[in-house]
UniProtKB/Swiss-Prot annotation:
Bilayer topology term: Multi-pass membrane protein
Gene that encodes it: RNASEK
Protein name: Ribonuclease kappa
Function noted in UniProt: Endoribonuclease.
Source organism of the structure: Drosophila melanogaster
Swiss-Prot/TrEMBL keywords: Endonuclease, Hydrolase, Membrane, Nuclease, Transmembrane, Transmembrane helix
PANTHER family cross-referenced by the UniProt entry: RIBONUCLEASE KAPPA
Keyword Membrane on entry: yes
Single GO cellular component term: membrane
Length: 95
């Protein structure tokens, strides 16, 4: 079933591949606790001890990594839909 045209399906393919690569890499960097991404963590302003801060930062890093990987999986679904549409459009124009 054709839902979108050939240009939109190709655009969806390109954007999906880029989104998958970017989100997988961001998830990896969050998972290894990259210091450059600490500004993106939902942390409180003050903590009672350094151990509390480290525990909260580790939880936030892991949660952000999982969120990135879940979003990458959603992009895989978009990639599959765009690929199916691209195939359907190329099949129609070949006939």
């Amino acid at each position: 079933m054709k839902i979108c045209g050939p240009k939109l399906s190709l655009c969806g393919l390109i954007i999906s591949v880029w989104g998958i690569v970017q989100l997988v890499l961001m998830g990896l960097f969050f998972y290894i606790n990259s210091v450059a991404l600490i500004e993106d963590l939902p942390l409180e302003e003050e903590y009672h001890s350094l151990e509390d801060f480290y525990a909260a930062a580790n939880r936030a890093y892991n949660q952000n990594a999982y969120n990135c990987w879940i979003a990458a999986c959603i992009y895989v679904l978009t990639l599959l839909l765009s690929a199916q549409q691209f195939y359907m459009n190329s099949r129609v124009t070949a006939n």
